[in-house]
Amino acid sequence: MNYLILISFALLVITGVESARDAYIAKPHNCVYECFDAFSSYCNGVCTKNGAKSGYCQILGTYGNGCWCIALPDNVPIRIPGKCHR
């Protein structure tokens, strides 16, 4: 049993674990990148520049009109619940 756990852990370390998430990309102070045109390429540019596969402007979303990114890397900050401190 211990060998199975050790081998599983070694495989995780060797292959690396990468994950991505779909979320609002955040500026410093937990603020979203605001957008006003759902058909603009602004959000796609912001998202792909930060390593996401794509992005779009989500109109009237949870945090207002903000950029929503698809497959955003874990090292990029996302909007979390709480206030935007500008």
Curated annotation (Swiss-Prot):
Keywords assigned by UniProt, alphabetized: Antimicrobial, Disulfide bond, Ion channel impairing toxin, Neurotoxin, Secreted, Signal, Toxin, Voltage-gated sodium channel impairing toxin
GO annotation, biological process: defense response
Domain LCN-type CS-alpha/beta: 21-85
Keyword Secreted: yes
Subcellular location: Secreted
Signal peptide segment: 1-19
Major location (coarse): secreted
Residue ranges listed under propeptide: 86
Disulfide partners: C31-C84, C35-C57, C43-C67, C47-C69
Recorded superkingdom: Eukaryota
GO cellular component: extracellular region
Keyword Cell cycle (UniProt): no
Tissues expressed in: Expressed by the venom gland.
GO MF annotation terms: sodium channel inhibitor activity; toxin activity
Pfam families in the record: Toxin_3 (PF00537)
Coiled coil (UniProt feature): none
Similarity field: Belongs to the long (4 C-C) scorpion toxin superfamily. Sodium channel inhibitor family. Alpha subfamily.
Note in the entry: Negative results: shows no effect on Nav1.2/SCN2A and Nav1.8/SCN10A. Shows a weak inhibition of inactivation on Nav1.3/SCN3A, Nav1.4/SCN4A, Nav1.5/SCN5A, and Nav1.7/SCN9A.
Biological role: Alpha toxins bind voltage-independently at site-3 of sodium channels (Nav) and inhibit the inactivation of the activated channels, thereby blocking neuronal transmission. This toxin inhibits inactivation of Nav1.6/SCN8A (EC(50)=790 nM) and drosophila DmNav1 (EC(50)=280 nM). The toxin (1 uM) does not significantly shift the midpoint of activation at the two channels, but induces a significant depolarizing shift in the V(1/2) of inactivation of the channels. Has antimicrobial activity.
Domain notes: Has the structural arrangement of an alpha-helix connected to antiparallel beta-sheets by disulfide bonds (CS-alpha/beta).
Name under which the protein is recorded: Sodium channel neurotoxin MeuNaTxalpha-5
